[in-house]
Amino acid sequence: MHKTNFNTLLIFLFLSSCFTFLFIRCTNCSSNNFVSKKTSDTLKSIKLSTDTIIQNDTIAKKYLLGQIIPSKDTNFIAIEKKYCGKNNSYIRKEPYAAFLKMYEAALKEGIHLTILSATRTYKEQKNIWEGKWTGRYLYYGKNLASLYPNEYERTLYILKYSSMPGSSRHHWGTDIDLNSTELNYFKSGKGLKVYNWLKENAGKYGFCQPYTKKDSSRVGFEEEKWHWSYTSLSSKFLACYKRQIAYSDLTDFAGYETAIKVKLIEDYVSGINKDCR
């Protein structure tokens, strides 16, 4: 074979192998970071500045109380199964756009974020609350109605980690639960790595942990390392909630009579990390 032709062949083979390698790398990358065209097109239309989207005095009580149908509300979007642990989960578009950016950033550092829960309607929260309140659902094997016959004590126990219907931040479409709802998960190994990353980076994407460890400056719900809130919106909803919602709006569920006794609005709805207000 002529020397020139031989050198040309070597160059061709080298470039072909490089192209194949890059193609495989790009294909793998695309499969890991793929966002559907539908979601991509939707997110392009989202304006992350909320000043003209949310006006403090125009938020309806029904919205604040979770009396909504997210699938029929144009402010919401269905979460792709890739990012969520279940089907038919919805979230407001603004926090979804922010989450997608946070997801990609975390993935580059070997952190995989999964949304376990996002928007929860009044009806859904009522089902959770009354299931625990009546003993219809066993809570870690316990029938709370039998274990706590005193309604005030039962309410305090359930309120450690579950909201009364009409008082959950998940009603607003701004809050997400990530990876696990067990504190032990975040104490070591992969869970600790996830939590440390979120503490360091979630704020860059607009998210804040509302239920930090309780101390003299925070009362209400117990610590929830999995719960993250898109603050630029949730802070506005919280301000509206405290101004517009009264205990007379929280009456359509079992055990509602105890809401005022435990200071639900003052201590639980308002009892969040000051950085999230």
PLM feature spans:
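Bacterial Sec-dependent N-terminal signal peptides
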Residues: 1-45, 49-52
